[in-house]
């Protein structure tokens, strides 16, 4: 049995789906407020639901019964949308409990090491780094291309419009969440000890580079606007809750760029990663609103 936390987010769902496709038993911890459509989508994979809060010992024991490993996606590139939650106390309780048990493998996906803008995601990453867990794998995932190159984050490619954060010239090694989920699964069964891996895409590209890729694919010129660094900082400063602040913090980091982390090798888990060029080629583009 594999316990997956953060199953209400895009990455957590993909981990559950892939594990079930391999015939693996999966227990998915989900928040009680999870939207019905996500519940049904996750239920269709055949996972075992575990909606109980993890703040008390009885719930933790029940969640970890017959579990061989935990894959935690709570502190990854969240929130994808405002409806998602991040229960830091539950995440901490589970991590500490698996450490006490000693025999469980703990695999956590979190934000890159270079991120410095304070948020619950960065704080959780730092706690993972400081945890003396006997069998822990930390996966530092770069920006998810499926999230940041979407209309919800200002990249409205179906209508050839792009709102770039900052000057758009800073490079990031964007990665597919599908590749991240596959690497997390391939880490299962690894021997004890602490391992850290950087999950970066194969290319360091700026937001302006990405716009050019889409313009070439669509044969259209994008209308490009920019959100200044001052405006991004103001959004962060006025954030009223941890989730909103985490979203604003990620925008600041996106504007700064996040090139590949050359100090942490991924060679021990060979996988042909999705390039941005390949990702763009797979997208279906809606026709322009004013087309005949």
What are the roles of these predicted feature ranges?
Residues 1-41, 49, 55-65, 75-84, ...:
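Oxidoreductase cofactor-interface core, primarily capturing Rossmann-like NAD(P)-dependent enzymes
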Residues 18, 187, 229-292:
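A hydrophobic C-terminal alpha-helical subdomain
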Residues 84-92:
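Glycine-rich anion/phosphate-binding loops
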Residues 95:
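Short, acidic/polar
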Residues 225-227:
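NAD(P)-dinucleotide binding in Rossmann-like oxidoreductases
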């Amino acid at each position: 049995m594999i316990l997956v936390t953060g199953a209400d987010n895009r990455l957590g769902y993909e981990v559950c789906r892939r594990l079930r496709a391999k015939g693996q038993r999966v227990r998915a911890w989900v928040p009680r407020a999870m939207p019905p459509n996500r519940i049904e989508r996750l239920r269709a994979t055949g996972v075992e639901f575990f909606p109980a809060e993890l703040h008390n010992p009885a719930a933790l024991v029940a969640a970890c019964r017959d579990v061989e490993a935990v894959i935690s996606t709570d502190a990854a590139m969240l929130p994808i949308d405002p409806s998602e939650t991040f229960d830091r106390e539950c995440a901490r309780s589970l991590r500490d409990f698996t450490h006490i048990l000693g025999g469980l493998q703990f695999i956590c996906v979190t934000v890159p090491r270079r991120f410095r803008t304070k948020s619950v995601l960065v704080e959780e990453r730092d706690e993972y780094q400081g945890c003396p867990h006997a069998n822990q794998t930390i996966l530092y995932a770069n920006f998810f291309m499926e999230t940041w190159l979407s209309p919800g984050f200002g990249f409205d490619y179906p209508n050839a419009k792009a709102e770039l954060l900052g000057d758009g010239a800073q490079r990031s090694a964007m990665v597919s969440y599908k590749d991240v989920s596959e690497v997390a699964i391939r880490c299962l069964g690894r021997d004890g000890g602490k391992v850290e891996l950087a999950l970066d895409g194969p290319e360091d590209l700026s937001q302006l580079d990405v716009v050019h890729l889409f313009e070439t694919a669509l044969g259209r010129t994008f209308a490009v606007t920019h959100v200044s660094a001052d405006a991004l900082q103001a959004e962060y400063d006025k954030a009223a809750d941890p989730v909103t602040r985490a979203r604003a913090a990620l925008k600041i980091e996106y504007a700064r760029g996040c090139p590949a982390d050359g100090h942490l090798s991924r060679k021990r888990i060979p996988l042909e990663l999705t390039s941005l060029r390949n990702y763009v080629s797979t997208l279906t583009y809606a026709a322009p609103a004013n087309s005949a």
